[in-house]
Amino acid sequence: MELKIGSTEAPMEKATFGAGCFWGVEAAFRKVKGVVSTSVGYMGGHFPNPCYLDVLSRITGHAEVVQIEYDPQLVSYEDLLAVFWDIHDPTTLNRQGPDKGEQYRSVIFFHNEQQAEAAQQSKAKVQVSGRFELDIVTEIKHKSEYYLATEEHQQYFEKQAKR
């Protein structure tokens, strides 16, 4: 279930990123001004209607992702890309920290051609910046079917803090 953070009258846009375990990725993007709602789920695989255990088993091809609804009048897609590069190591293939497997891969799923172009330009800029010693392995792909994760995974860190 998506939790609305704010509301405006302007049309919202969507962005989808995979950068490791979706719990932390979602928590980082929820702090960004202009992000209206977030949800976590799965994208980019070949297995229909996967559950967490399916994805964890590495048989689905899906990545854990956060889907973001944002107000482009308050935050740009390029700003969201900057957060994406800041919150994970885009040079490790199918791994973030101790989490290993293709479900933890670094991936940007674009929703339109403007996002595709911005993602490619951003990746190239970060690569030549010298910020990372190794090559960036982040995939840039057109969005595919998004499968919402179960409620227990939504805003996971916020729920844990309330315990």
From Swiss-Prot:
GO biological process entries: protein modification process
EC number: 1.8.4.11
Active-site residue list: 21
Pfam families: PMSR
Catalytic activity: L-methionyl-[protein] + [thioredoxin]-disulfide + H2O = L-methionyl-(S)-S-oxide-[protein] + [thioredoxin]-dithiol; [thioredoxin]-disulfide + L-methionine + H2O = L-methionine (S)-S-oxide + [thioredoxin]-dithiol
Keywords tagged on the record: Oxidoreductase
Broadest EC class assigned to this enzyme: oxidoreductase
UniProt keyword Lipoprotein present: no
Record-linked InterPro entries: Met_Sox_Rdtase_MsrA_dom, Met_Sox_Rdtase_MsrA_sf
Keyword Oxidoreductase set for record: yes
GO molecular function, one term: peptide-methionine (S)-S-oxide reductase activity
Entry superkingdom: Bacteria
Cross-referenced HAMAP family: MsrA
Function: Has an important function as a repair enzyme for proteins that have been inactivated by oxidation. Catalyzes the reversible oxidation-reduction of methionine sulfoxide in proteins to methionine.
Family: Belongs to the MsrA Met sulfoxide reductase family.
UniProt protein name: Peptide methionine sulfoxide reductase MsrA 1
UniProt organism field: Nostoc sp. (strain PCC 7120 / SAG 25.82 / UTEX 2576)
Gene that this polypeptide is encoded by: msrA1
